Amino acid sequence: MGCVTSQEDKAAVERSKQIDKSLRMDGEKAAREVKLLLLGAGESGKSTIVKQMKIIHEKGYSQEECLQYKPVVYSNAIQSMIAIIKAMGQLKIQFGHPDRAEDARQFFALAGHADEGEMSAELSGIMKRLWKDVGVQECFSRSREYQLNDSAEYYLNALDRISAPGYIPTEQDVLRTRVKTTGIVETHFTFKDLHFKMFDVGGQRSERKKWIHCFEGVTAIIFIVAMSEYDLTLAEDQEMNRMMESMKLFDSICNNKWFTETSIILFLNKKDLFEEKIKKSPLTICFPEYTGANTYEEAAAYIQLQFENLNKKKDTKEIYSHFTCATDTNNVQFVFDAVTDVIIKNNLKDCGLF
């Protein structure tokens, strides 16, 4: 009888050890699983960050995948030109050369029938002539007065290359493409022995109600702000300043009861565009109380402070801020490396392994 009890005790001890081991393994596995939620207003650069993860942490874009973006490149270039020509009418800007008015008429006729994935020599020729026109360039320089894609200048400057026979989009061309994100896009990758699940959520106001079920159990939120949009209004609401909308959204995320334990990482994005714009467009457009110089360093630091000051729990919650250029692979790689180190440290702490 005593022998049986002893065997039962041994079995119980063994079971207990197995349970402990299993719990430990589950804890370590949980510490290695990272759920990242990408949040931010529309057109802040969330989808570009997702594309960079594919380039940096997966195998990048194959030639076949790049070719799939060809229609998007053409569509972005054509839509940008359409936006500029239409804005010339609104802003009462004349073409520099009278022949360009006929080119514009031809352009609209051809643009509507452009074969998907192809750009005819006639269409590209017209677009090149229009893009060189001084009136078109004047209108482009006033793009804050209407809605224009960030990639407009990039593609229109590259018309020779992108309209050449046999054109295959480069990874940089792919990074610059703009397609509105609807719904939720999930990306998986492994980095530093961590298994990442990244969720890109539609930033336009109409999409926000779809976010909520992504929130539970999220490791960190990467909130993306387009710094260069301090002087722009929303595509969905011409009265609302984009930076103010971004701050409003950040306030609601940062101080949300669901995220008291969640790391908040702030990407102050489009720093390259901001650096160019701040020379011409004063920060007081968005922040009338700003008295600093219109230099990149001072103005960028001021924007960072405005966002960090929205944090109502400074004693217990830290905002990890980074200045980013989402189209610059090296910059994103460097920043994401730093972000991952913070996540590892916080994850191990949460799982009692640090």
Swiss-Prot record:
Mg(2+) binds at S47, T181. One of its GO terms (cellular component) is heterotrimeric G-protein complex. Residues 196-205 are annotated as: G3 motif. GO terms for biological process: adenylate cyclase-modulating G protein-coupled receptor signaling pathway. A lipid is attached at C3 (S-palmitoyl cysteine). GTP binds at residues 40-47, 175-181, 200-204, 269-272, 326. It comes from the Eukaryota. Residues 32-354 form the G-alpha domain. Residues 173-181 are annotated as: G2 motif. A lipid is attached at G2 (N-myristoyl glycine). Keywords: GTP-binding, Lipoprotein, Magnesium, Metal-binding, Myristate, Nucleotide-binding, Palmitate, Transducer. G proteins are composed of 3 units; alpha, beta and gamma. The alpha chain contains the guanine nucleotide binding site. Belongs to the G-alpha family. G(i/o/t/z) subfamily. This is Guanine nucleotide-binding protein G(i) subunit alpha. It comes from Lymnaea stagnalis (Great pond snail).
